[in-house]
Amino acid sequence: MGTKNIGKGLTFEDILLVPNYSEVLPREVSLETKLTKNVSLKIPLISSAMDTVTEHLMAVGMARLGGIGIIHKNMDMESQVNEVLKVKNWISNLEKNESTPDQNLDKESTDGKDTKSNNNIDAYSNENLDNKGRLRVGAAIGVNEIERAKLLVEAGVDVIVLDSAHGHSLNIIRTLKEIKSKMNIDVIVGNVVTEEATKELIENGADGIKVGIGPGSICTTRIVAGVGVPQITAIEKCSSVASKFGIPIIADGGIRYSGDIGKALAVGASSVMIGSILAGTEESPGEKELIGDTVYKYYRGMGSVGAMKSGSGDRYFQEKRPENKMVPEGIEGRVKYKGEMEGVVYQLVGGLRSCMGYLGSASIEELWKKSSYVEITTSGLRESHVHDVEIVKEVMNYSK
């Protein structure tokens, strides 16, 4: 028998970070990081390339807050290019301050260029801009979509995400090599969970590695296929290789609380990709639904039947199958409506700042060097959550 046990896998709920002596206040920490070899972020947050999470409104919001959004690919090439152009044509605070300081700009202008009123300049003083002063944006493509990549690059996209459920595969590597040989663009490749995959993708030109097979709330890959590595262990394994090449790791999936972001970064990620937490915000493209007195937004995995029918089948090697022959690796569901994304991101960033303060880390690079963790038991997890009391007033950043 060739099967071997390569060890225990840990995920976010299995560990707690250990506090250090600190002279660092949360408000003083720097959250700047690398998305790829050549593209930076002001905050280490990325909205996922899902058709119920990121189109131009989400991407604009993320970039204005210092992160980045990845436009999903479940649309034709022209539509995806237009989504990228809407982000690039959005008037940033920098441009407003220089050219239209007193102008009240509508969210959607009549000439097709998207703009937004400058109601809260403090919230958007950390914008993630390219070298022309435009908001940064990424876009996802699948295997062999060279023409799509070319059109996106011509539209000014800042990064291409070559997206697959199994990034350590022949056609992904072939597509990566072709893009890198023909275009001057940074490419993130995923998803992977092993040292071998990380090394091979980097050696073939990857500028960023996306880590995670099956940790997402709407993903069933680990149950349907029996494949995956718990996310903390996957990040550790992949970052141990990527760090030697100076290539950033993006932790994709499994984030439920702000504390999980700190854990992902502490074990080696440079940024995290988020889906479900942002799916309930106003800026996501998911439809609203009122059930009783509660508003929800539609949210589905890219491995669900609905998403695969709309164009993500190639991500799961099922692009040519009829619906009744598809084997889904995700579900369709709903999440509670949360209002505008600014408040959600504020809580995530605030929790991360607190984490770094506890660990005495003024930067993400310091966090890598100073962090240590303990494995906890189910009793330790139970103790970590609210217990022996009934919550009578909900808070934005916690639910059990």
UniProtKB/Swiss-Prot annotation:
It is an enzyme of class 1 (oxidoreductase). InterPro entries: Aldolase_TIM (IPR013785), IMP_DH (IPR005990), IMP_DH/GMP_Rdtase_CS (IPR015875), IMP_DH_GMPRt (IPR001093). Residues 96-116 have a biased composition (Basic and acidic residues). Its EC number is 1.1.1.205. Keywords: Cytoplasm, GMP biosynthesis, Metal-binding, NAD, Oxidoreductase, Potassium, Purine biosynthesis. Signal peptide: none annotated. Mycophenolic acid (MPA) is a non-competitive inhibitor that prevents formation of the closed enzyme conformation by binding to the same site as the amobile flap. In contrast, mizoribine monophosphate (MZP) is a competitive inhibitor that induces the closed conformation. MPA is a potent inhibitor of mammalian IMPDHs but a poor inhibitor of the bacterial enzymes. MZP is a more potent inhibitor of bacterial IMPDH. Resistant to mycophenolic acid (MPA) inhibition. It catalyses: IMP + NAD(+) + H2O = XMP + NADH + H(+). It is found in: Cytoplasm. IMP binds at S217, D252, G253, G254, G275, S276, Y299, R300, G301, M302, G303, E329. Belongs to the IMPDH/GMPR family. Homotetramer. This is Inosine-5'-monophosphate dehydrogenase. It comes from Cryptosporidium parvum.
